[in-house]
Design a protein with these regions (language model features):
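Accessory DNA-binding and partner-docking regions appended to nucleic-acid-acting proteins
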Residues: 425, 461-463, 471, 490-495, ...
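Residues forming the flavin
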Residues: 2-448, 453-455, 459-468, 472-498, ...
């Protein structure tokens, strides 16, 4: 007997099949695409720049902090600047690579224990107008990094940005600020300050929570000679501004225990505060594909396990560049990322039979060790920043901006106040009681507090939520698992996701596909006409749409309920 409501055989059409798809046109992605295409492999190179300004407004994929100028909405101008800022795109295009700009990868799918209907592994792609599926034989993930964001009083104001967000805006000449305070004095912080000066910005402060500055002393002196003032043993007391935008930052000195020293406040005029405390590898697509990830604090967090060709445990999937680990070498020099890209591109070509093994091995030997080079662990440093911010700013600071979840609500495992919901039972619980129930994880906290459930999809709060959980549990942050990732991994409008007319199968079987209770009624015992069935799931016999369920709910075949 055939179940007409089954989804098997009803998948959306696959528009194209490509032997090798590269996601991310940074140093690693471009190098991989060039290596493979020169071996005779058909290559598609995907990059989401120029970004949809609506995504930028949601701080996706970087923390832009509403500091984009109006030029960011001029797509033709932005396309020109993206190509100008990345000469590798032109080289790839001339070499025969199919370069897809302004395209986001919102999903990655392959057959597995719970999914068997796909013809092969596919990517979900989208631009501002439409969405489509592309099948691949080999895939390289070169998606780079995310900004690590740790909050402070006033961090929800426009003008608080991340190092990646600032770098993207200045590189494409759409940054709408002038005076910049940088948080963090390590290689990333110093590089951010240097690039800001080169872009014609004024760097009014570099702030460091530790007593010792962390970056290269030579570069530190150079910046100081150019008028940059450094503030060791300081943290942010508050970002201030009367119009919802940053107008100044107040710093406060810390003692050896990271406690604030009363009367040591310093207010500095600025319109932008840049978080340059660190970066985290972008592993969402790798997680979707089931690649094995392991925690490495010296590489920025969870990173993929790779073999000698930078292949992952997911069949046919490679990883290269910053998404395999962030360390000092990659911050200072993208040559490491380029080497990784070449190696991964060569590995993909070899696995496709496009290059003989002897030649591939020779090139790999020439490249030498291009894997991630360990540096010092970073999470202890981030914990210093978080602890100092809690001591200075307290628990009424947002831990999650999108859902307006405060630190107090996170620790108390309470939903955000805007919901107007209270439960005496839940009020008696908190992280402490959850810990007694078993290992804690971010998915659990997301469901109970909504932290990480907003449109930025946890990009602004993921690390600080993990740090909070580790602090409360008294465990290393590496024991806090990553949250689950599900498609779409980019905010996506329904109009873009499915612009076509609703197919007949969806019209006939939406009751089953959308998880309505009657899906459990066997299809051979009754047929539910979706157009004639209204389902109400309110509690206590009350319809969710007002009135009583007796008045509005039709009898559902096979349930015995009226």
């Amino acid at each position: 007997m055939i179940d007409p409501s089954s989804v098997v055989g009803k998948a959306p059409p696959i528009e194209r099949r490509v032997p090798f798809v590269v996601v991310g046109a940074g140093a690693a992605g471009v190098a991989a695409a060039l290596e493979a295409v020169r071996a005779g492999v058909e290559v598609m190179l995907i990059d989401e720049n120029p970004l949809d300004p609506d995504l930028m407004a949601m701080d996706v994929p970087h923390y832009f902090g509403q500091r984009m100028s109006l030029s960011a909405r001029n797509r033709a101008l932005m396309l020109e600047r993206v190509i100008e800022a990345n000469p590798g795109l032109g080289r790839a295009d001339e070499a025969g690579v199919d370069v897809q700009l302004g395209v986001s990868v919102w999903g990655a799918f392959r057959n597995g224990p719970t999914q068997r209907e796909l013809a092969g592994p596919v990517l979900g792609l989208a631009n501002e107008e439409r969405s489509w599926l592309v099948r691949y034989d080999r895939l390289l993930i070169a998606t780079g990094t995310r900004d690590v964001v740790l909050g402070f009083p006033g961090w929800q104001k426009a003008g608080v940005v991340g190092a990646n967000g600032l770098a993207s805006l200045t590189r494409h000449r759409v940054f709408a600020g002038r005076q910049l305070a940088v948080l963090g004095s390590g290689p990333l912080g110093l590089q951010t300050a240097r690039q800001a000066l080169e872009a014609g910005l004024e760097v009014v402060a570099v702030v460091e929570v530790t007593a010792e500055l962390r970056g290269d002393p030579v570069e530190t002196r150079r910046l100081a000679d150019q008028g940059v003032r450094f503030y060791p043993s300081h943290t942010v007391q508050e970002a201030s501004g009367r119009t919802g935008e940053v107008e100044s930052v107040t710093l406060i000195r810390l003692d050896a225990d990271l406690a604030p020293i009363a009367g040591s406040e310093t207010e500095i005029a600025c319109d932008t505060i840049c978080l340059a405390l660190g970066l985290a590898p972008n592993v969402e697509l790798l997680a979707l594909l089931g690649a094995t990830l392991r925690f490495r604090s010296d590489l920025g967090g969870f990173v993929p396990e790779t073999d000698g060709w930078l292949g992952t445990s997911a069949p046919g999937v490679f990883a290269a560049g910053d998404c395999t680990g962030v360390h000092e070498a990659l911050v200072a020099d993208d040559g490491v990322a380029r080497g990784q890209g070449r190696l991964a591109g060569l590995g993909a070509a070899l696995s496709l039979g496009a290059v003989d093994r002897a030649r591939a091995e020779a090139v790999r030997t020439e490249l030498g060790g291009v894997g991630a080079r360990p540096s010092e662990p970073v999470h202890a440093y981030w914990r210093h920043w978080l602890r100092s911010s809690i001591r200075v700013g307290g628990l009424e600071v947002y831990a999650c901006q999108c859902e307006e979840v405060t630190r107090r609500e996170l620790i108390g495992v309470q939903p955000p106040r805007y919901l107007g919901w209270h439960s005496a039972g839940m009020s008696a619980r908190g992280l402490g009681t959850l810990l007694r129930d078993g290992p804690i994880n971010q998915d659990q906290i997301k469901r109970l507090t909504r932290a990480g459930m907003g449109p930025c999809q946890g990009r602004r709060c993921r690390e600080q939520v993990a740090l909070f959980l580790a602090e409360e549990a008294g465990v290393p942050v590496g024991q806090i698992p990553l949250p689950s990732f599900r498609a779409p991994v980019r905010p996506l409008s329904l109009q873009v996701l499915w612009p076509r007319d609703e197919p007949e199968a969806a019209r006939d079987h939406w009751v089953s596909w959308f998880g309505i209770p009657t899906q459990f009624t066997p299809h051979w015992t009754s047929h539910v006409d979706a157009s004639e069935t209204t389902v109400f799931m309110g509690l206590g016999g009350e319809s969710q749409h007002g009135g009583s369920s007796v008045e509005k709910q039709r009898e559902l075949p096979g349930t015995g309920r009226g």
